Amino acid sequence: MRYGLIGEKLGHSFSKEIHELLGDYEYCLKELKPEELEEFLKKREFAGINVTIPYKEAVIPYLDEVEPAARAIGAVNTVICKNGRLVGSNTDFYGMKSLLEREKISLEGRRVYILGTGGTSKTAFAVAKDGGAREICKVSRTPHGEGEISYEELYARREAPEILLNTTPVGMFPKEEGMAADPEQFPNLAGVLDVIYHPLRTDFVCKAQKIGVPAAGGLYMLVAQAAKAAELFFDDPSFLEKTERIYRTVLERKENLVLVGMPACGKTTVGRLLSEATGREFADSDRSFEERQDRHIADFFRTEGESAFRQEESRILKEL
């Protein structure tokens, strides 16, 4: 492997697809158990790698050099092997800052609350500090460090948070339901950011958008940090110019198209045509319902009622 991503569980990762859109190089996903990390790094059989959960801090002792910005953050997500020496960088900082700028979410003079205390929370703290936040606080289930509070304390301060940055895995595929904190509970909220990109919009992001708060998931951050990593891999800044185009390409590939309408209005016909045109799988919730119930929807309505139908329909849609 010359270029790739290391982490403990990578089944959800979009990184291979993104890097192979960025340039003509093979990018591999390599899952490592904690006890395998040291041997992998000592072998140095790669040119450049990205690092994800749970190794952004764990890799640091094995590096010959850590760039000052990454050392200040305390987390590394990019490692390059230069002349046999391992050099660590942090491109998540660039990615998160780029996402905030794209979404026009300003941190200047605002109270920023970071959900989580892992490696990515350190990047979020550095971005908030760089962005001129008035107050920066980390929220943890088990607070113990300076500037950390519990979720109970977060809700007790409901008037304070103006920006919420989620760096926890709560809401990430395959356990998409739930959120680390409920945006609706904070009346002065001006922006929400979730580093999770799979699903594209977590419950956390959807809830914020529902109440009119600017919010974004982590896909653009992922693409931007990947472009920055490619710049470091190949010493070529032109990769950064591809960020927006690749983001839109990946978004188009990953977003679902949902057709909603009255019975017999043509949803199935249009859906099949779209499936053929885009190469996406076609799923028909009505057909799935009837196959599961072994009867027509109209018969179910007559005997069970609309409420029961909607409950079962919701379960099917979640599975789809």
Regions found by a protein language model. Give the residues of each.
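Glycine-rich adenosine-cofactor-binding loop
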Residues: G7, N90-F93, L100, G109-K129, ...
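Adenosine-phosphate binding glycine-rich loop
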Residues: V195-E255
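Walker A/P-loop
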Residues: T268
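ATP-dependent small-molecule kinase phosphotransfer cores
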Residues: R287-L320
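NAD(P)-binding Rossmann-fold cofactor-contacting core
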Residues: G131-E148, A283-Q293
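Rossmann-like adenosine-cofactor binding region
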Residues: G147-A216
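Phosphate/diphosphate ligand-binding glycine-rich loop within oxidoreductases
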Residues: R2-E103, P199-R201, K207, I211-P214, ...
